[in-house]
Amino acid sequence: MTTVVAFILMFGVLVSIHEWGHLIFAKRAGMLVREFAIGFGPKIFSFTKNETLYTIRLIPAGGYVRVAGEDPEIIELKPGHHIGLEFNQAGEVSKIIVNNKSKHPYARVIEVENVDLDHKLIIEGYELDDDENRLSFNVNEKAMFVMDERETQIAPYNRQFASKSTGKRAMQLFAGPMMNFVLAIAIFLILGIIQGVPVEEAKLGEIQPDTPAEQAGFQQDDVITQIGDQSISTWEEFTSIVRENPGQELDMVIQRNGESQDISVVPGEAEAVNEVGDPITIGQIGVYQGFEKDVLGTFVYGIERTYDTTTMIIQNLFMLVTGQVSIELLSGPVGIYDATDQVVQTGFSNFLLWTAMLSINLGIINLVPLPALDGGRLLFVGLEAVRGKPIAPEKEGIFHFVGFALLMLLMIVVTWNDIQRLFL
């Protein structure tokens, strides 16, 4: 149960912060945001605030921000349509009744002759009992369509995605991944405040019970200064030697309470994979890195850790694309849930660390220039900036549709790999 709650909380935060970035920059640019959704599929919960419908949906596979103009409008008025009009106190059309006009007895029913809801915001037509006097009505920029008793706000061109400059559109698309990096930095800052920041020297933190380190007599705050004939000055040097010597006795010199002591330990053997995904055996002795409280160091740690994690993920992604790493090592929702279950059992700090890493992963993946991802859409905005004119919407739509289908296929393959690896 704890894992389920942790997974839902983690998923909700990662997706919400990503989509919130898109939402905020869309609204700052003056775009009409029709919906802010967490999840896909049927709605579980919804409410409307400041023009936007906020929804939580059943399938936890992402989220989206639906901006006016990105997709064809569902409701389209054409000459010959019979519609009902309701007006505000200024005499402007405030509601356009598309059907079920009998439920709106005070609506003025007309037959549409001409309509422009993009630029001029007018509706022209004739009353049903008078086909000689052509009437013209000004439409309020926030007027509502009413169809099947559901209200949908009209979207004048100046509120649509395509009406904004390439810079504003690019920023709206980039804002989602950007917020994932901001979240990661914030989490690392929180970790720095809670547990301190890692010290550069090979200083031991917590000693795990029933491990070679405990059996050899290591204590927290011991500082490793030498292994064999090699001087040790950093944590990376210490862990590298331990990893490379599973089952081999290592003679170490430590500093404890200002005095040097000799101590020997035999690293245990643990299964792992190398940088290309091949199984290897590494050495472990069961110690955590030492930490210290440092206000300035906390901020540096947050940024450095985000940068290091970003670099690592990009390198792994490059190896995947070039075939150096098998697609079988990819994890989908099932694999991420299983990993979350293992992380939750190791403590809150590790759960925060795992959340930060996934947030960076989400940000990077969305910036990859693939169809249906933020990076793919940024690619089209960039091409428009270079060409001086946009790609035909029909061509871009096909590109994203095919890409989305391929991504869904990849998700199915990855999920099946997870199921085989974990359950079969």
UniProtKB/Swiss-Prot annotation:
Lineage: Bacteria, Bacillati, Bacillota, Bacilli, Bacillales
Keywords: Cell membrane, Hydrolase, Membrane, Metal-binding, Metalloprotease, Protease, Transmembrane, Transmembrane helix, Zinc
Annotated active site: E19
Task of the protein: Is responsible for Site-2 cleavage of the RsiW anti-sigma factor. This results, after a third proteolytic step catalyzed by the ClpXP protease, in the release of SigW and the transcription activation of the genes under the control of the sigma-W factor.
Record bears the keyword Transferase: no
Gene of this entry: rasP
Sites where the protein binds Zn(2+): H18, H22
Descriptive protein name: Zinc metalloprotease RasP
GO CC, any one term: plasma membrane
Cross-referenced NCBIfam families: RIP metalloprotease RseP
Family from the record: Belongs to the peptidase M50B family.
Protein's organism: Oceanobacillus iheyensis (strain DSM 14371 / CIP 107618 / JCM 11309 / KCTC 3954 / HTE831)
